[in-house]
């Protein structure tokens, strides 16, 4: 197993990142190692039990081991692997177990702390900040809806295009509705009534992703669906 050096970041990150600030429901769930959170538009997002039809964040899955669908993603990957929005590090851990050099980055102090406590190479850093590039990343991962980071899918993909090697790929897990394409101010809430500060987010389906990718200089290489999860492999446009 090969880990990349997780040099400590001195970057100051704003509290209005994914699920940050406010009542800190994401941090509470990470501390518990479990919990169902709801991601919903900030406007009119009352603090209610997690309902059907909203984006449900399964922290137990994020904090647990990679499942068979995750492992298949890594079987299609080439190293080194950069997991953007890595959370507590399940994909970094799985990549290392598969013999792929890997590094995770996340803006959540709590998530990075959990990952580092497990001995994983994870940086407290934004993808839009300084990220080690060297000769380029073999695979950049945007899983678990992380194509929504920053509320600007085209901008995020353009940044990933800068990081990926010419022979590499950006693997994106998309919204199950192929045509979905919306950016919005979101909040995360939990059943205990905790609520994050609003943050910029987006939801993108596989069809809409192709348009954002084209604007970023990327092209669709392949798509697949496993266990209700949809993935798109993007490669640098020729």
What are these regions (language model features)?
Residues 2-76:
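S-adenosyl-L-methionine
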Residues 78-87:
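Conserved class I S-adenosyl-L-methionine
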Residues 108:
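Conserved SAM/SAH-binding beta-strand->alpha-helix loop
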Residues 119-129:
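Conserved SAM-binding strand-loop segment of SAM-dependent methyltransferases
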Residues 130-140:
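A short acidic, Gly/Pro-enriched loop at the edge of an enzyme's catalytic core
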Residues 148-160:
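A short, conserved alpha-helix within the catalytic core of class I
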Residues 167-175:
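Conserved beta-strand signature within the Rossmann-like core of class I S-adenosyl-L-methionine
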Residues 199-217:
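Short alpha-helix
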């Amino acid at each position: 197993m090969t880990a990349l050096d997780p040099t400590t970041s001195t970057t100051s990150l704003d509290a209005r990142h994914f699920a940050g600030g406010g009542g800190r429901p994401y941090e509470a769930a990470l501390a518990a190692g479990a919990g169902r959170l709801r991601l919903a538009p900030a406007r009119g997002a009352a603090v209610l039990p997690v309902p059907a039809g909203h984006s449900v964040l399964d922290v137990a899955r994020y904090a647990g081991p990679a499942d068979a669908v995750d492992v298949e993603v890594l079987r299609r990957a080439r190293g080194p692997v950069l997991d953007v929005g890595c959370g507590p590090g399940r994909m970094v851990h799985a990549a290392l177990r598969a013999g792929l050099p890997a590094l995770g980055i996340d803006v959540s102090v709590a998530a990075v702390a959990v990952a580092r406590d497990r001995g994983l190479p994870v940086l407290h850093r934004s993808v839009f900040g300084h990220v080690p590039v060297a000769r380029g990343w073999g695979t950049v991962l945007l899983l678990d809806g992380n194509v929504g980071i920053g509320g600007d899918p085209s901008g995020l993909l353009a940044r990933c295009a800068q990081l990926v090697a010419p022979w590499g790929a950006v693997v994106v897990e998309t919204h199950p509705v192929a045509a979905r394409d919306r950016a919005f101010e979101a909040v995360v809430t939990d059943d205990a009534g905790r609520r994050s500060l609003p943050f910029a987010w987006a939801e993108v389906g596989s069809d809409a992703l192709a348009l954002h990718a084209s604007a970023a200089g990327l092209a669709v290489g392949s798509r697949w669906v496993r266990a209700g999860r949809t993935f798109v492999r993007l490669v640098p446009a020729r």
